[in-house]
UniProtKB/Swiss-Prot annotation:
GO cellular component labels: cytoplasm
Any one GO MF annotation of this record: ribosomal large subunit binding
Matches recorded under NCBIfam families: frr
Protein name (database record): Ribosome-recycling factor
Cellular compartment(s): Cytoplasm
Organism per entry: Lactobacillus gasseri (strain ATCC 33323 / DSM 20243 / BCRC 14619 / CIP 102991 / JCM 1131 / KCTC 3163 / NCIMB 11718 / NCTC 13722 / AM63)
Amino acid sequence: MANEVIEKAKDNMKKSIAVFQKELGGIRAGVANASLLEGIKVDYYGVPTPLTQMSSVSIPEARVLMVTPYDKSSLDDIEHAILASDLGITPANDGTVIRIVIPQLTGERRQEIAKQVGKLAEKGKIAVRNVRRDAMDTLKRQEKNGDITEDEQRSLEKQVQKVTDDATKEIDKLADQKSQEITQG
């Protein structure tokens, strides 16, 4: 039962890291990436709909995204949703598709994005620490109920701490890689 606590903590920390990686994928580094548009919701007949569910996104050139809506009547709504996002990109609507040229990043914009990566990393670490706290609370409860001894509790808490440290290092490593990718262009 105690090993289940460790395994559950590992699993939940891996999920937290996966969420962090997905969020990092949405941060642009001066090249076209379809995941850049994943978080955008379009008001489609009064229902907020993910852009990726109502259009196909292709990359015809290194710094160009092309959005082709399945329903041409939603073209203007898609354009407005992209403009309303805080991605710093401007869509060009030609009546059938929307082209988005990803601008070169300025030094100032690179620093802003690097700060955004830092905030995401902190959010990921908080999620990992919450998993750690839950695991520690479970171990304390088990010791209090007599399911495990005090020595077992201490040993398991050390294991949870090691898993937490490893997850935190992984998040730091991913954040550093993304920051370098952004600042070096």
